[in-house]
Design a protein with these regions (language model features):
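Short glycine-rich donor-binding/catalytic loop of glycosyltransferases
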Residues: 58, 74, 78-88
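Nucleotide-activated donor-binding/catalytic signature segment of Leloir-type glycosyltransferases, i.e.
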Residues: 20-38
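Conserved catalytic-core segment of nucleotide-activated headgroup transferases in glycan assembly
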Residues: 1-25
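Short acidic alpha-helix that forms the nucleotide-activated donor recognition element
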Residues: 39-51, 71
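A charged, aromatic-enriched C-terminal amphipathic alpha-helix characteristic of glycosyltransferases
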Residues: 98-101, 112-142
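Short alpha-helical segment that forms part of, or immediately flanks, the ligand-binding pocket
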Residues: 44, 63-71, 85
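Acidic donor-binding loop of glycosyltransferase active sites
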Residues: 48-61, 74
């Protein structure tokens, strides 16, 4: 389980339905908070609060989650096999499911060197060809 490789990261796992017993068992770890049958207001708060979005859910995407994570400037990291909207994810943040330890290493490195998150977010925006306020100012010559 990826949470074991990243004890310094807190994981918020939300579902709009009930969670499987396997997923519920992850609640035993101190760095995991589970939100089964999550209310939209709680989900909105998580999108605003969290810095990372792990696109590792084997089921269908809910609430346009990857796009919302992108709009909330969250670093999106996921498994190639479960990606829901790869358009918003930089290639360097996509791992094979069997490479979960590599994904954990990359996240741990980002946590250890916070400047890396800014670089990774810049690559993510570039991958999605996103514009920010500075880009618009340059276009408008402001």
């Amino acid at each position: 389980m990826p949470v074991l490789f990243m004890p310094q990261m807190h994981f918020h796992v939300a579902a709009i339905t009930e969670m499987s017993s396997k997923l519920m068992s992850a609640g035993q770890y101190e760095n995991v908070s589970l939100y089964p049958n999550v209310k939209m207001s709680v989900l909105d708060g998580l999108f605003e609060k969290c810095d990372f979005y792990l696109d590792i859910n084997h089921e269908g995407e809910i609430v346009d989650a990857v796009h919302r994570a992108f709009l909330n400037n969250m670093l999106i990291v996921g498994y190639e096999e479960t990606m829901h909207n790869a358009y918003y994810t930089a290639d360097t943040n996509i791992f094979k499911e069997s490479e979960y330890a590599d994904m954990a290493d990359a996240l741990n490195m980002t946590l250890a060197m916070p400047y890396l998150i800014d670089e990774a977010l810049a690559m993510q925006k570039k991958a999605a060809v996103a514009a920010d306020a500075t880009d618009y100012r340059e276009i408008l010559h402001l």
